[in-house]
Amino acid sequence: MDVREVLYDCLRSTEQLAEQRKLCITPCFDEKPVLVNCDEVQLRRAFTNILTNALRYAKEEIQIECKADRGKAIVRIHDDGEGIAPELLPHIFDRFFSTRKGGAGIGLSLAKEIVSLHKGTISASNDGGAVFEISLPLRKTT
């Protein structure tokens, strides 16, 4: 499956929320397919959970990168919001952890679980806003 197509599906499904918040989403994807073995529905759910968080906290813009690098598919979702408080970073993937009133705290923990099931990694950091980076093994070509 081409990760770029999964991301485009996520962008289409969150387009209305982005328009309501007057946010610009800038995709920067490799020109060539970024192929991984995956459960497309589950991977879409993981990306959508992360993108929805970015849509909640971004001020004006979200950048989404997708590239192949050293045998990995790298997806980076970067918003221009306040970022994640340093003391919260170690907990954001914990099940039921939420800083939002009424938040269930399931979205990011589910995203991490899905990425892990695909033999990938996910991390969060701050760089002028929150940055989520997902790394998945590329599909081996024969």
Q: At which residue positions do the language-model features occur?
A:
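Acidic ATP/Mg2+-coordinating residue in the GHKL
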Residues: 79
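A conserved beta-strand-to-alpha-helix junction within the catalytic ATP-binding
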Residues: 1-12
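Short beta-strand/loop element within the Bergerat-fold HATPase_c
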Residues: 61-71
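Short conserved segment of the HATPase_c
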Residues: 84-96
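Short alpha-helical Gxxx[C/S/T] motif in the catalytic ATP-binding
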Residues: 107, 111
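Conserved micro-motifs of the catalytic ATP-binding
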Residues: 35-38
